[in-house]
């Protein structure tokens, strides 16, 4: 009987016949999560959470531990692959109106926030020059909180500056948060299967469904294979493609890097933060760049669920995608003209998409005479 239940969950799950390749990224994200937990465990076995030994322990893993270099590269590049998949997954949700399944969407955005926190803590653990200074800049934003800011920052740091207690607690958080991600992922999948996934046409798929296995499982395997191949090729031939050159030097609190920046997958939010010449305003914009995703289900006014047949929304969606890429690029540049203006314009366009959604939905209803 238990075998039958497992089959029902993963094999006989009824899925719409017309879901496209864009629906494959959920299974790819699960694979990334499994890989990160596995490689992370083997790295944690050899890692030392001490400011004097952390950098040396990373070098030791790369040089002395059998296949340690592979574990480290897979973990670092796997994180980038994780974020590429999750950003595409969210973009698909925005384009095809998956956010109207409110509970699934809310759990997914909570999952994104937890993932971003986990990745941030992990970036600090290498104790390279950029890790230290990126952590200093980002955690220092807590001081912008009125009244409580300084106390919160001191509490997070475990002292009056980033030091040994900070590294220890960041390691503890980086170790424990993946289990929260696993729990949230389970909740996300349960909520998704409660209502069923959307499809490219946005129609009710109940009249035309097929079992998940073997039809969609085989389709998922193709992209999964390509992703794992890409991961191993990059890890073997271009292992430092996503690394910052400053991070190959041990952290030195007395020397400030010329240009402080976090990992590439946070650059869009960091670019929005930098575009506002005010600490509190920038911190709020940074938080809102993610939190604004929570309001999307409540601002949908269009009668049609996906953007497949909504040209105005399509235009705004692809503007959002190009804006996201442009902010990411601008955030890698120094804070000087013309990059300041580019960041400010693209940040405004980023928020414009979310604010214009209800107006565009209403306009498209009028254009198509849908009351």
Swiss-Prot record:
Name of the protein described by the UniProt record = Cytochrome b
Topology in the lipid bilayer is annotated as: Multi-pass membrane protein
The free-text note explaining how the cofactor binds reads: Binds 2 heme b groups non-covalently.
Record bears the keyword Transmembrane = yes
Which annotated residues bind a ubiquinone?
A: 193
Protein location: Mitochondrion inner membrane
The UniProt family comment states: Belongs to the cytochrome b family.
**GO BP:** mitochondrial electron transport, ubiquinol to cytochrome c
Q: Mind naming one GO cellular-component term on file for this protein?
A: respiratory chain complex III
Q: Does the keyword Transport apply?
A: yes
Gene3D superfamilies (alphabetical): Cytochrome Bc1 Complex, Chain C
| Top-level lineage group | Eukaryota
Subunit structure, as described in the record:
The cytochrome bc1 complex contains 3 respiratory subunits (MT-CYB, CYC1 and UQCRFS1), 2 core proteins (UQCRC1 and UQCRC2) and probably 6 low-molecular weight proteins.
- What keywords sit in the KW lines? Electron transport, Heme, Iron, Membrane, Metal-binding, Mitochondrion, Mitochondrion inner membrane, Respiratory chain, Transmembrane, Transmembrane helix, Transport, Ubiquinone
The UniProt annotation places heme b b562 binding at 75, 174
What this chain does, per the entry, is described as: Component of the ubiquinol-cytochrome c reductase complex (complex III or cytochrome b-c1 complex) that is part of the mitochondrial respiratory chain. The b-c1 complex mediates electron transfer from ubiquinol to cytochrome c. Contributes to the generation of a proton gradient across the mitochondrial membrane that is then used for ATP synthesis.
Q: What else is known?
A: Heme 1 (or BL or b562) is low-potential and absorbs at about 562 nm, and heme 2 (or BH or b566) is high-potential and absorbs at about 566 nm.
Q: Identify the residues that bind heme b b566.
A: 89, 188
Source species, please? Aspidites melanocephalus (Black-headed python)
**Stretches that traverse the bilayer:** 25-45, 69-90, 105-125, 170-190, 218-238, 280-300, 312-332, 339-358
Which cofactors are required for activity? heme b
């Amino acid at each position: 009987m238990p075998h039958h239940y497992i089959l029902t969950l993963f094999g006989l799950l009824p899925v719409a016949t017309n879901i496209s390749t864009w629906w494959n990224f959920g299974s790819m994200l699960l694979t990334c999560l499994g890989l990160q937990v596995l490689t992370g465990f083997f790295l944690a076995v050899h890692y030392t959470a001490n400011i004097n030994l952390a950098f040396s322990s990373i070098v030791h893993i790369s040089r002395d531990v059998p296949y340690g270099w592979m574990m480290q590269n897979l973990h670092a590049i796997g994180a980038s692959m994780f974020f590429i998949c999750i950003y595409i997954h969210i973009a698909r949700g925005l384009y095809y109106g998956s956010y109207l399944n409110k509970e699934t969407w809310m759990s997914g955005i909570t999952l994104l926030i937890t993932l971003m926190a986990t990745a941030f803590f992990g970036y600090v653990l290498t104790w390279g020059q950029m890790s230290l200074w990126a952590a200093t800049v980002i955690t220092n934003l807590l001081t912008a909180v009125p009244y409580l800011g300084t106390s919160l920052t001191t509490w997070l740091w475990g002292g009056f500056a980033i030091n040994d207690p900070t590294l220890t607690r960041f390691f503890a958080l980086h170790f424990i948060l993946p289990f929260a991600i696993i729990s949230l992922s389970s909740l996300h999948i349960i909520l998704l299967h409660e209502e069923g996934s959307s499809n490219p046409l946005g129609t009710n798929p109940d009249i035309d469904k097929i079992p998940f296995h073997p039809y969609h499982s085989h389709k998922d395997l193709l992209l999964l294979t390509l992703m794992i191949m890409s991961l191993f090729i990059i890890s073997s031939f271009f292992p430092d493609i996503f690394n910052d050159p400053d991070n190959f030097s041990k952290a030195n609190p007395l020397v400030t890097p010329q240009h402080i920046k976090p990992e590439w997958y946070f650059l869009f939010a960091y670019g929005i933060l930098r575009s506002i010449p005010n600490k509190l305003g920038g911190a709020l914009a940074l938080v809102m760049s993610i939190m604004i995703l929570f309001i999307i289900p409540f601002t949908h006014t269009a009668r049609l669920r996906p953007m497949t047949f909504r040209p105005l929304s399509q235009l705004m969606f692809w503007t959002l995608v190009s804006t996201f890429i442009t902010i990411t690029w601008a955030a890698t540049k120094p804070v000087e003209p013309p990059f300041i203006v580019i960041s400010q314009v693209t940040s405004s366009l980023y928020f414009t998409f979310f604010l214009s959604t209800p107006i565009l939905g209403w306009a498209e209803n009028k254009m198509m005479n849908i009351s």
